[in-house]
Amino acid sequence: MDRRDFLKTVAITGAALTIQRSEAMEVLTQTINKANGSNPDLVAVMGGEPEEMFRRAISELGGMKQFVKPGQKVVVKPNIGWDKVPELAGNTNPKLIEEIVRQCFAAGAKEVVVFDHTCDDWQKCYKNSGIEAAAKKAGAKVMPAHLESYYKPIDLPKGKKMKKAKVHEAILDCDVWINVPILKNHGGANLTISMKNHMGIVWDRGFFHQNDLQQCIADICTLQKKAVLNVVDAYRIMKTNGPRGRSASDVVLAKGLFISPDIVAVDTAAAKFFNQVREMPLDTVGHLANGEALKIGTMNIDKLNVKRIKMSVSYTHLRA
C-alpha cells in the first residue's frame, strides 16, 4: 500500500487511533521521578511532533554537543527494516532522523552515516520509509547493509550465548553512534526497542532466533562500542502484529519520545509506556533483565534522575 492509498484507508476507516486525554502523560511517567537541577539520566516527552520532541529532549541533556564532538564521524542507526510508509509505524519516523542528523552536524560532526540491515528489500525500505530522503536532506550519507562484505567480526567476551558477531563496518569505523529505534510489538521478542535495534548492525540475525533470542539481544549490547545515546521513537506505536504489521489498525498515535544514554533504562521506560497500549509485562521482555544482569544498564528507573515534559494540553489516550 502506498501513502496515498494508506491515507484514503485511514480517512474511511479511522483505523489510526488517536487519543485526547491527559491521563496519557501520567501513564508515561507514573513510576518516574522528577529530575533535579543536574542533567537528567532520562528524558520522557509527550505531545509534540517527532522533531520538536527531540529538540526539547536533547536540550534537557545539555545539547548534542554533549554526545558529538567537532570533527567526529557519527552513525545514526534507525530501524528501517520494512517496506512501509511512516504512517504504518514499521520504521523509525523520518522527521526524527532528519532532526538528529541536523543536530549532529550543528555539533560539529565531520560526517554522519545512516544505515540499517533491513528485512525487506533494502532499497524499497530506505525509500518508502522516507528515511533515505530525510537523511540525505539533512546532509547524511546513506549506506547499504545487504551484503556480508559490509560486516567485520568482533568478539563479545561478556556474552552468554553470543560470543562473537559480524558487525557493520560503519559502526566499527565511526567515532560515536546514536541508536534510534521505534517502539513496537515484536512476535519473537514481544517488544523491539533500543536493545533489539542492535540486530540491525549485525549480519547473522538467524543466530539470535536459534540461540535464545532474549539472551542474544542482551549479549550484542555488550559490544565495546556502545551507542552514546538511545532515542526511542514512540510517536506512532505498532501495538499488534509486529514487527512488520498488517494494516493501519495495528497503529496507535501516541506522540511520545524517550531519550537516555542508558539503554536498559530507556527501554524499560518505553516498555512501561507500551504496556498502556497493550498489556506487556516487563518480565515477558526478557532481554531487559538479561541486559541488567550483564550490567549494561538498569531497569530501576525509580532511582534515576528523570525529566518529564508535556508539550501540549491534548494527548492520545493509550488505554486500549
Located regions from the model:
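N-terminal and secondary-structure boundary signal
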Residues: 1-318
